[in-house]
Amino acid sequence: ALPIFAAETLKVDWENCEIVRGNTDRHLPYSTYQAGSNTMFTEARTNHLAALDAIRKLKEIAAAELGGVADDYDIDGARVFATADNSRGMTYGEAAQAAINMGGEYSGETYPDNLNDVTKRAVEGLAGTGLIGVVKDSRHEGMPPSMAIGFMEIELDTQTGKYEIVDYSCVADCGT
């Protein structure tokens, strides 16, 4: 369950999370299951980055509503609060309501141009319903990591150091 990366980034207890996927009534596109090394490489980072975008917006909303600048604020999994006085803050729910009132990028009424078309449609469908954290992860460089293991049986001539390969087996996870 790769959404756990977003939950951990937002410091939200996993028990308080609801995963909803593949529900077009809620503007969530159908997708394949999440498994394999390629999925971990691509989707884990994207979930983390979307959560970082939400955190940035939570802090900016708190600064706009409560005063100061975004860097004056932090999160604890349920609230965004002033680091100098943690009694000055707001719940994630209150910040989501403020996002609706503020509009623009906070509520998904505007979003980055470089998003995938499916993601754009999802954001458009969710716009105005709360705080929207959304990004396109374009940092991927190189090939996704893969995992492989090989086993070799040899016959070794201990006098000459020469060997003969008797059997070889290899298993590779090529990603999904």
Predicted regions and their residues:
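Cofactor-binding beta-sheet edge motifs in enzyme active sites
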Residues: A1-T176
